[in-house]
Amino acid sequence: MKILVTGFDPFGGDKINPAIEAVKRLPAEINGAEIIKLEIPTVFNKSAEVVKKAIEKEKPDYVLNVGQAGGRFGLTPERVAININDGRIPDNEGYQPLGEPIHEDGETAYFTQLPIKAEAKAIRDAGLPASVSNTAGTYVCNHIMYQVQYMRDKEFPNIKAGFIHIPFLPEQVVNRPNTPSMALGDIVKGLTAALSAIVERDGKGDIKAVEGANH
């Protein structure tokens, strides 16, 4: 089994992005699966082009995109990606779409194929906070999650794909009072647990567990 794991470069004025820093530190093999690591730009469309080339080259069984969600306390596997680009800030090439569809011929939304409840449980079992998230935002994180699902829908039907958000690093919140963060080593530990759960649940589907939200 082969899993392509991607992490974004820094954006929004930060000099570091925990996504790519954590991805780079993942082991080369987790629970018997080969881990392919890829840095992608925080840029609408270009990020998808980079991922598509890697899919064509590596032919992974799974794709897990990792992104920073500053303000969240734990690791949060994402349930759904929506067909909208709506940038709160410009991307790293200065592009700021304001309520535009990602693909005119794409579905309104795509659900992940990954066992997000099993991922969240595995992360918590590793001693770290985690919960299922029902929104990946409307920036490049949601964009790449949606784009990979669109690729799956149109070109790569055998791939299973999803996204997980991670918190800020402590050094990123020095001047962001009362903002949660997580040590890089713990983020790596959490991602490793999530990836192990993906491998363990291969062919079995997700677990039955309470992970819903009222709002």
Swiss-Prot record:
Gene Ontology terms describing biological process: proteolysis
GO molecular function: pyroglutamyl-peptidase activity
EC number: 3.4.19.3
Reactions accelerated catalytically: Release of an N-terminal pyroglutamyl group from a polypeptide, the second amino acid generally not being Pro
InterPro entries cross-referenced by the UniProt entry: Peptidase_C15 (IPR000816), Peptidase_C15-like (IPR016125), Peptidase_C15-like_sf (IPR036440), PGP-I_bact-type (IPR029762), PGPEP1_Cys_AS (IPR033694), PGPEP1_Glu_AS (IPR033693)
Coiled-coil spans in chain: none
UniProt subcellular location: Cytoplasm
Active-site residues (renumbered): E78, C141, H165
Signal peptide stretch: none
Pfam families, alphabetized: Peptidase_C15
First-listed, main subcellular location of the protein, grouped into a coarse class: cytoplasm
Taxonomy, superkingdom: Bacteria
Entry keywords, A to Z: Cytoplasm, Hydrolase, Protease, Thiol protease
GO (cellular component) term, any one: cytosol
PANTHER family: PROTEASE FAMILY C15 PYROGLUTAMYL-PEPTIDASE I-RELATED, PYROGLUTAMYL-PEPTIDASE I
Oligomeric form and interacting partners: Homotetramer.
Function: Removes 5-oxoproline from various penultimate amino acid residues except L-proline.
Protein's UniProt name: Pyrrolidone-carboxylate peptidase
